[in-house]
């Protein structure tokens, strides 16, 4: 008939070979997503996308859907200082540290309809004070692009004390380096669809 119907879109439609299905409850449509509590330097976290619903009808069969990122991208330029140019420094771990537990992990329902900030919101995540990234990356003295990137959930509130603790192998001996807290009068609040970049220099 001529009745218009809402068309929803999300990505991916399956995870580890299992279909991701839409659930409906009291007019709210959502899909279940998982945000990892730890990841690798290669990045195993799935990039979840959603679209603003669009109406289709008998007289309006051609529609266009624009997808948006539900997660936040965080990238690092991690390099060694010139006075360590003769030594082999291998990055082994990045510990993203949130003093008041503003990092978000776990299973959530990604909302596919709603108004304003309701759309694309991840409901049901748990707060945590740490997310670890692990791998092996030999550090250079200069970089033209980030050498580590990850996807994390948006923060539900601002973090006043955000820092990074790095584990670095220095000529066979593991050492820890911790950055100062990222200073901002209003704190740090990672938002969905945004890309945050941090530069960290390792000195010996």
Where are these predicted regions, by residue range?
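Edge beta-strands of extracellular beta-sandwich domains
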Residues: 174-183
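Short, low-hydrophobicity acidic/polar segments
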Residues: 1-90, 95, 132-148, 160-170, ...
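Short, ordered, surface-exposed loop/turn motifs in non-cytosolic proteins
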Residues: 84-125
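Active-site/ligand-binding surface loops and adjacent short beta/alpha elements
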Residues: 116-142
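Short, surface-exposed linear segments at secondary-structure transitions and domain or protein termini
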Residues: 115-121, 184-198
């Amino acid at each position: 008939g001529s009745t218009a119907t809402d068309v929803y879109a999300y990505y991916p439609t399956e995870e580890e070979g299992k279909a991701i299905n839409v659930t409906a409850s009291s007019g709210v449509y959502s899909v279940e997503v998982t945000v990892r509590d730890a990841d690798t330097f290669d990045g195993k976290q799935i990039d979840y996308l959603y679209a603003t619903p669009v109406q289709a009808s008998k007289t309006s069969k051609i529609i266009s859907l624009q997808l948006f990122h539900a997660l936040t991208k965080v990238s690092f330029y991690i390099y060694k200082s010139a006075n360590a140019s003769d030594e082999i420094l291998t990055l082994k771990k990045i510990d993203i540290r949130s003093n008041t537990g503003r990092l978000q992990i776990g299973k959530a329902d990604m909302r596919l309809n709603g108004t304003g900030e309701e759309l694309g919101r991840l409901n049901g995540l748990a707060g945590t004070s740490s997310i670890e990234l692990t791998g092996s990356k030999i550090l250079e003295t200069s970089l033209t692009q980030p050498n580590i990137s990850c996807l994390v959930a948006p923060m539900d509130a601002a973090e006043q004390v955000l820092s990074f603790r790095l584990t670095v192998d220095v000529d066979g001996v593991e050492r820890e380096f911790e950055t100062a807290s990222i200073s901002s009068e209003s704190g740090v609040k990672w938002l969905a669809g945004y890309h945050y970049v941090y530069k960290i220099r390792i000195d010996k």
